């Protein structure tokens, strides 16, 4: 059976900020974050994570309010439930919350939990709110709204209470290497750029669109990728696009020694290696650790050449980025130096 898009929306800034937090939660704060390659914006739900081959979906509904009642939270689950009873297979259901009532949780210290940590009274209200909202929606067939089905669904939902500032989500992308970006204002500026990029994805109209297979969602361009987000962060830090064509000025000293007929091939190989290193999900932490080390050395020795910086990088740190070889790492150093230093 096909899937029909209904109730896509445009948000105020506060809601947009919160959707960005929800997306960055998927990117960095789950044990299975490394499996997520695409972040689909306001198509299936506020945010839906998707793996590289469109076989797995992480469905997220966000609710920025910190004061909603248990019944209101139940109402907010309606789109997740709609997807649950659809013919598409969603791997995980998440509601990302700005806050919950004091009487909502059994253990108030848990910010990521399932229905087993919700008090019986609150859970009853959640169920009531969800049932009422489902009944009001024309896009959920009445025979699918049963207590048994709703209760089964609630056992699958993850409740995530946001306990972080925007800057914290960016720190997680750069793997908490504080030397890379020194101030929270810079981190917030990066967060805002990601938010704006995410909001741009809503400029197309998809209300009423029907798709037969999950992968068809990519045809509508309402997605960001893990790689795009990392690249955006890196661009902001070094004030340039590291994947841009051309030879960085500090690298010319190395290129000039290379046989002329082999130069273009060597440069292209360096660019490919940098691209693979940046987009290697399994080595993301090592990439940012290496970047921090290069960044620190360049700040300490701004007038020294690429070979000098290369010789002072810890070999253990280099080994954590298997996509680089000697020349491509020197190329990366040159790219960073060109962006950071006049």
What are these regions (language model features)?
Residues 35-37, 55-58, 89-93, 327-329:
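Generic structural motif recognizing short loop/turn segments at the entrances and edges of beta-strands
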Residues 1-10, 65-311, 325-327:
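Acidic metal-coordinating catalytic centers involved in nucleic-acid phosphodiester chemistry
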Residues 1-21, 340-342:
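N-terminal intrinsically disordered, low-complexity tails enriched in polar/charged
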Residues 25, 309-342:
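Hydrophobic, glycine-enriched assembly/anchoring segments
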């Amino acid at each position: 059976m096909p899937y029909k898009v209904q109730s896509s929306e445009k948000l105020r800034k506060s809601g947009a900020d919160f959707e960005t937090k929800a997306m960055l939660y998927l990117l960095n704060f789950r044990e299975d974050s490394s499996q997520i390659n695409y972040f689909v914006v306001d198509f299936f739900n506020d945010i839906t994570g998707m793996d590289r081959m469109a076989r797995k979906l992480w469905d997220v509904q966000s609710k920025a309010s910190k004061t909603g009642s248990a019944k209101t939270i139940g109402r907010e689950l309606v789109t997740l439930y709609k997807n649950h009873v659809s013919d598409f297979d969603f791997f995980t259901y998440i509601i990302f919350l700005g806050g919950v009532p004091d009487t909502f949780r059994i253990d108030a210290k848990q910010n990521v939990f399932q229905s087993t940590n919700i008090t019986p009274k609150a859970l009853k209200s959640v169920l009531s709110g969800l049932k009422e909202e489902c009944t009001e929606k024309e896009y959920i067939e009445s025979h699918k709204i049963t207590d048994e089905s709703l209760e089964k669904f609630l056992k699958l939902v993850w409740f995530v209470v946001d306990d972080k500032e925007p800057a914290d989500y960016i720190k997680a992308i750069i793997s908490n290497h504080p030397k890379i970006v020194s101030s929270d204002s810079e981190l917030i500026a990066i967060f805002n750029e990601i938010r704006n990029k995410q909001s741009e994805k809503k400029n197309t109209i998809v209300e009423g669109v029907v798709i037969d297979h999950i992968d068809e969602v990519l045809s509508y361009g309402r997605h960001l990728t893990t790689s795009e987000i990392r690249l955006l962060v890196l661009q902001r830090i070094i004030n340039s696009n590291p994947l841009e064509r051309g030879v960085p000025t500090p690298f010319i000293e190395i290129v000039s020694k290379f046989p002329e007929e082999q130069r273009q091939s060597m440069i292209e190989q360096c660019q490919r290696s940098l691209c693979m290193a940046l987009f290697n999900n399994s080595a993301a932490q090592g990439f940012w650790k290496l970047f921090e080390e290069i960044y620190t050395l360049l700040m300490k020795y701004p007038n020294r050449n690429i070979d000098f910086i290369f010789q002072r990088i810890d070999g253990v740190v280099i080994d954590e980025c298997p996509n680089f070889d000697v020349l491509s790492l020197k190329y990366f150093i040159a790219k960073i130096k060109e962006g950071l230093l006049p």
